A protein has these predicted regions:
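N-terminal helical cap/lid subdomain that shapes the substrate entry/recognition surface
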Residues: 2-4, 8-22, 27-108, 116, ...
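Electropositive, surface-exposed helix/loop patches at the edges of structured domains
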Residues: 95-98, 120-123, 186
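Short, flexible active-site loop motifs that bind/organize anionic cofactors or intermediates
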Residues: 48, 77, 97, 122, ...
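A generic secondary-structure micro-motif detector
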Residues: 33, 62-63, 100, 122-125, ...
Length: 240
């Protein structure tokens, strides 16, 4: 990443550009990579081993915490005093990403075509910084973002999307104060609902063709492929 780098918790010097916030997992790479499935197995393993649960109970509690808090780790920290960095080592950092994620020239071209004079590309993820950096490095796009707002597992209180404070944190770190200048894409309906509720009207829900769309739209824009951003937000891209 260039410019402000991680910027976690630190507000950079403000500029007048809009900011385009990109989610990472199942957004910058497709769900067909099944990284979420790999992660779910590792999370269930962690619940089973560290909480002494049966596999069925581990899966149920994992899903409950994910639904209640947006991240399984938040439930573990709140209710079981788990060390989130140790959890990260056993789950996120243990994923075989090098065997799954490869450079994506089409994605790189899309990001290169952003009008950087008017738009600042920024990563916005519920993952820890280690995972975020691994993914964008393997995709071959680490030089195309100016910073990342992530869930800081080392912080006293875990903060993640769709908590409104997480959107406030992203704006602070990206150096922007006007919600009308925030563009955002995520594959999570809950996160898109949270973004729109926070005032990010230019929020886009990415729903791949093989995924089930929500019965009620999560926000004003829904696409099935990142390339569709060129059509719904032509102002974001450089003129031909």
């Amino acid at each position: 990443m260039t410019g402000t780098g991680e910027a976690n918790g630190v507000a950079p010097a403000a500029d007048n550009r809009n900011v385009f916030f990109f989610d990472i997992d199942n957004c910058l790479y497709p769900k067909s990579y099944k990284i979420h499935d790999h992660m779910s197995v590792l999370i269930d393993d962690y619940f089973q081993t560290h909480l002494g649960l049966s596999r069925e109970d581990a899966t149920m509690l994992h899903q409950r915490y994910y639904k209640d808090y947006g991240l399984a780790i938040e439930g573990l920290v709140r209710h079981h005093k788990v060390d989130p960095l140790e959890y990260n080592d056993k789950v996120d950092d243990a994923l075989p990403l090098d065997d799954i994620i490869k450079p994506n020239p089409q994605l790189r071209k899309l990001l290169e075509d952003l009008d950087r004079k008017n738009f600042k590309p920024w990563l916005f993820t519920n993952a820890y910084i280690n995972h975020a950096k691994r993914v964008i490095r393997l995709l071959g796009i680490e030089d195309l973002f100016e910073g990342v707002t992530y869930c800081d597992y080392a912080a006293p209180k875990l903060l993640c999307k769709p908590d409104p404070d997480m959107f406030a944190k992203a704006m602070r770190e990206a150096g922007i104060s006007d919600v009308s200048k925030c563009y955002y894409i995520d594959d999570s309906a809950l996160n898109c609902i949270g973004g729109k509720a926070y005032g990010w009207k230019n929020t886009v829900h990415l729903v791949e063709p093989e995924s089930k769309a929500p019965s009620q739209p999560a926000c004003d824009h829904q696409i099935s492929n990142l390339e569709e951003l060129r059509t719904i937000f032509p102002e974001v891209f450089k003129s031909a």
